[in-house]
Amino acid sequence: MEHTLPPLPFDKNALAPHMSEETLEYHYGKHHQTYVTNLNKLIPGTEFENLSLEEIVKKSSGGVFNNSAQVWNHTFFWNSLSPKGGGAPTGALADAINAKYGSFDKFKEEFAKVATGTFGSGWTWLVKKTDGTVDIVSTSNAATPLTTDAKALLTIDVWEHAYYIDYRNARPKFIEAYWNIANWDFAAKNFGA
């Protein structure tokens, strides 16, 4: 089965000024596409050849895992963003965040602290644990909650290619801008699923 680059859920210029069209040209059009291309080169003739992307992520290791997980992580990241994003979550997700962190502002502070403190390349995730509570998880490189019992709700990509064009080496500024485009509707849908 050949894997393809999923379409973005928004136009490449729709996230400006928080994320530029140029960033999306490179991040989506080059980096994400390269993971798809590499995966398609790695799986022919293997046990992964006819598996879904999620099955490959859960069952693979090495280069196959790195590329398949990065395809999945990036697709999840694009869905974690919206030109109509920002604001704060509502309903059950807001209740879960407030129960864990005391307030949405305290959650944002903790999320930003974890994302800023992620050493090297990786991801910061808001996840739902099996007991129904939420947590903030940092993963390195291509690691993903998909291989755990936690359910991903929302993520931010903290690899340098995610922000270097717009923010240079200022990861905290990128994280601050992220709150303007965070897709809380997507996170709430994941929380309820």
Curated annotation (Swiss-Prot):
<comment type="function">
    <text>Destroys superoxide anion radicals which are normally produced within the cells and which are toxic to biological systems. Involved in the metabolism of 4-aminophenol. May have an indirect role in hydroxyquinol metabolism by scavenging and detoxifying reactive species that promote its auto-oxidation.</text>
</comment>
<dbReference type="InterPro" id="IPR019833">
    <property type="entry name" value="Mn/Fe_SOD_BS"/>
</dbReference>
<dbReference type="GO" id="GO:0046872">
    <property type="term" value="F:metal ion binding"/>
</dbReference>
<comment type="subunit">
    <text>Monomer.</text>
</comment>
<dbReference type="Pfam" id="PF02777">
    <property type="entry name" value="Sod_Fe_C"/>
</dbReference>
<dbReference type="InterPro" id="IPR036324">
    <property type="entry name" value="Mn/Fe_SOD_N_sf"/>
</dbReference>
<feature type="binding site">
    <location>
        <position position="157"/>
    </location>
    <ligand>
        <name>Fe cation</name>
    </ligand>
</feature>
<feature type="binding site">
    <location>
        <position position="27"/>
    </location>
    <ligand>
        <name>Fe cation</name>
    </ligand>
</feature>
<feature type="binding site">
    <location>
        <position position="74"/>
    </location>
    <ligand>
        <name>Fe cation</name>
    </ligand>
</feature>
<dbReference type="InterPro" id="IPR019832">
    <property type="entry name" value="Mn/Fe_SOD_C"/>
</dbReference>
<keyword id="KW-0479">Metal-binding</keyword>
<dbReference type="InterPro" id="IPR001189">
    <property type="entry name" value="Mn/Fe_SOD"/>
</dbReference>
<protein>
    <recommendedName>
        <fullName>Superoxide dismutase [Fe]</fullName>
        <ecNumber>1.15.1.1</ecNumber>
    </recommendedName>
</protein>
<dbReference type="InterPro" id="IPR036314">
    <property type="entry name" value="SOD_C_sf"/>
</dbReference>
<keyword id="KW-0560">Oxidoreductase</keyword>
<comment type="similarity">
    <text>Belongs to the iron/manganese superoxide dismutase family.</text>
</comment>
<dbReference type="GO" id="GO:0004784">
    <property type="term" value="F:superoxide dismutase activity"/>
</dbReference>
<keyword id="KW-0408">Iron</keyword>
<dbReference type="Pfam" id="PF00081">
    <property type="entry name" value="Sod_Fe_N"/>
</dbReference>
<feature type="binding site">
    <location>
        <position position="161"/>
    </location>
    <ligand>
        <name>Fe cation</name>
    </ligand>
</feature>
<dbReference type="InterPro" id="IPR019831">
    <property type="entry name" value="Mn/Fe_SOD_N"/>
</dbReference>
